């Protein structure tokens, strides 16, 4: 689970990542929250959440630690419609084996490294839809969505229920 990152370590000091932060700011995305999640074995996943002016698009930047000590990053744009459809456009390059909830519409573009092109693709997907402004705290929203994703995959038989994981694994 994610929690607030109060350590001050948020944006890695890498040119491309700093350029992404500046791009978000210049495109009127405002920082909402810095988050961190412990993945075990001293591996920490950091994330920064930004939101556009009217609150209809959230940007989540994931900072992924690599074995060689460098940091990779992925970007995800998400929006929700008034009828509870969740649209996600991201460039995550890690495989996902599992199921998404029926109201999620996910578009993966792992080869799109340009934030501008990824945002343009997301804006095309949400054009003409009635969007709901995000008001929930990012850490709460992300953890809720993670719970929804886990439940969906437990119900589909892809993941083992938590009470059986010690015996059977995840």
Regions from the PLM with identified roles:
Residues 13-169:
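Structured extramembrane domains adjacent to transmembrane segments
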Residues 1-15:
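Transmembrane-cytosolic junction motif
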């Amino acid at each position: 689970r994610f929690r607030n990152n109060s350590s001050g370590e948020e944006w890695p000091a890498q040119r491309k990542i700093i350029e992404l932060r500046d791009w978000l700011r210049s495109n009127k995305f405002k920082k909402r929250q810095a988050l961190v999640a412990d993945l075990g074995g001293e591996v920490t996943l950091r994330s920064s959440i930004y939101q556009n002016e009217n609150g209809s698009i959230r940007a989540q930047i994931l900072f992924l630690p690599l074995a060689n000590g460098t940091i990779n990053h992925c970007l995800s744009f998400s929006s929700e419609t008034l009828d509870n459809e969740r649209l996600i456009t991201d460039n995550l390059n890690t495989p996902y084996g599992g199921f998404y909830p029926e109201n999620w519409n996910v578009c993966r573009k792992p080869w799109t490294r340009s934030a501008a092109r990824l945002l343009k693709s997301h804006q095309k997907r949400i054009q003409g839809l009635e969007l709901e402004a995000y008001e929930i705290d990012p850490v709460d929203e992300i953890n809720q969505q993670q719970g929804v994703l886990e439940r969906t995959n437990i119900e589909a038989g892809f993941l083992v229920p938590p009470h059986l994981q010690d015996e059977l694994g995840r």
